[in-house]
Amino acid sequence: MSSPQSKIHFVDAFPAFNEVDLCLFRIRYLRNVVNHFVIAESSISHSGKTKELVFQNWFREREHEFPYVTIIHVNLEGLTDSWSREIYTREYLQDYIYSTYLKSNFIISDLDEIPSRSQVEAMAGREEYVHFSTPTYYRKLNLRLTDGHSAWSRGVMGHTSLVQLPNGGRFTKLPLLTGVDHGAHFSYLVRDNKGFDAKLEGFAHVELNQPVLKTKAFLKFVDDFQVDHLGRLNEIGNGLLEFIPKEKFNDLQRRLFEMFPDFAVESKTQFSRKQRLLASFIVTMIVNQPKKAQDLSNFFISKQFSLYFLAKIFPCLLSGILSFLTSISKRKVKLLKSQYISVQ
């Protein structure tokens, strides 16, 4: 589809908080395959805090540039918890689509869950529900998670001729759209501390709004070591982010990089795997927030003590401990073998 007058109507709908740059990219990237965009915004964040109507104000000044964008206001007053606000927003958005765009395909996903153009094209005219694949990237467009988030697929495509689903179908078991390029989930994609702070404060995951996660020292630490800022040492990938070089960008990443090159990290971290594992251990300990770990993280930050000291010295100690444990294990295996042979 090249224009809003195309026979097949496709609507892209998503809730938004304050991510103007990423929203602008999503609109421009999908404009050739989507007829209309609907953005749901509220004066209350999912965490329950009062917020500015960023998108209503931004688009009001640019209505002539974006006649194919509609901003709808969602009243979240009276809702008592973060997840109720998130679900209500998504279902309000779904109700609006069904009442406004008859016989139309639609996308409902979070703003940072962006489908590829080929995913949208593959669904045009199809009267069915699907999830679409959006592997997760943290903080930069080319730092990919390697745990279960690599198979992230919570976004939904459907058709208004179908029955509405709870929560916009986000957690409904639906077939996965295959045979096309992946989209991308650009989570926490921000330029600086201020944007990261705002993301945490507005997030439905209120348990993650910890002061230590919003310090410059902490963010520099996780960026330099290219580790998950939520830790996840005990999960697949051990909280280590995978660096994707420019030559391996997919179409969506290339387009985003062309528009906002500072959303990409230039090079792979120079720290070794052992150093990065230790960094992931430190972050996991801090985020899990046992009392001692929180006191330790506060000490490092309040004293402006460099966490790099730990990352450079401890790997040597860690390596020694691992070697020692390995040697013990080998001796135990030899001992067991000898005992087994002697019994035989």
Q: Can you annotate each of these PLM segments?
A:
Residues L102-I114:
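Short beta-strand-to-loop acidic/aromatic patch adjacent to the donor-nucleotide binding site
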Residues F10, L30-S47, F66-I71:
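Short loop->beta transition adjacent to catalytic acidic/histidine clusters or analogous donor-positioning motifs
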Residues S45-S104:
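Active-site-proximal specificity loops/subdomain of glycosyltransferases
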Residues P135, R170-P290, K312-L317:
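C-terminal catalytic/acceptor-binding lobe
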Residues E266-Q344:
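Membrane-proximal basic amphipathic "stem/tether" segments
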